[in-house]
Amino acid sequence: MKLGKKYKESTKLIDRKTLYTPLEAMELALKTAKANFDETIELSIKLGVDPRHADQQVRGAVVLPHGTGKKVRVLVLAKGDRIKEAEDAGADYVGAEEYVEKIQKENWFDFDVVVATPDMMGVVGRLGRILGPKGLMPNPKSGTVTFDVAKAIQEIKAGKVEYRVDKTSIVHVPIGKKSFEVQKLLDNFRVLMEAIIKAKPSAAKGQYLKSVAVSSTMGPGIKINSVKVLE
């Protein structure tokens, strides 16, 4: 199989026992991205937290200086003056109950991020079981529940990404594309790592950054020396 052959070629370029510097890792992530499409470059960060405890959750959002390379479709759930404000700011879809019903009845998901004004959360709450498992539920911590919809849309379109520790204590976040220059990946990497380090819960004990790895969509994982993540 072609893909298997490419993957094997990619694995020959890395030493699985080596902890690379961030620069070396970004260079290797691009070299091992051999698929015939613009692969996403993603970070996987294993944290020393127990997400079963509410006081050890790691969640937030950060604007990457060079974005992710992906066109993000934004759905805004609002009413009144906020509708025009959202449209002017570049939202892809703006409305209220009609979109809530569309999601419920038609299983409609032609969007990547949902922004809602606080006065809409009573209605949006009906979507908790649908949007929650997909990581699409608006949340004040990630800045997606706000009356300042224009600012939220602008930040999302500029490259704002959400990060959240999963039940296995890992955070998965895209930091760019194969088409990015190494320096842009490195800039995005540093900004994201700074945010995650700042988000360390006070209840987390011991080593916080257990492991950090970067990979392309179809490429192997490349381990990064967690001591050097901000160098």
Curated annotation (Swiss-Prot):
Molecular function GO labels: rRNA binding; structural constituent of ribosome; tRNA binding
Listed InterPro entries: Ribosom_uL1_bac-type, Ribosomal_uL1, Ribosomal_uL1-like, Ribosomal_uL1/biogenesis, Ribosomal_uL1_3-a/b-sand, Ribosomal_uL1_CS
Record carries keyword Chloroplast: no
Signal peptide positions (record): none
Keywords per UniProt: Repressor, Ribonucleoprotein, Ribosomal protein, RNA-binding, rRNA-binding, Translation regulation, tRNA-binding
GO biological process, any: regulation of translation
One Gene Ontology cellular component annotation held by this UniProt entry: large ribosomal subunit
Stated role: Binds directly to 23S rRNA. The L1 stalk is quite mobile in the ribosome, and is involved in E site tRNA release.
Family named by the database record: Belongs to the universal ribosomal protein uL1 family.
Subunit structure: Part of the 50S ribosomal subunit.
Name of the protein: Large ribosomal subunit protein uL1
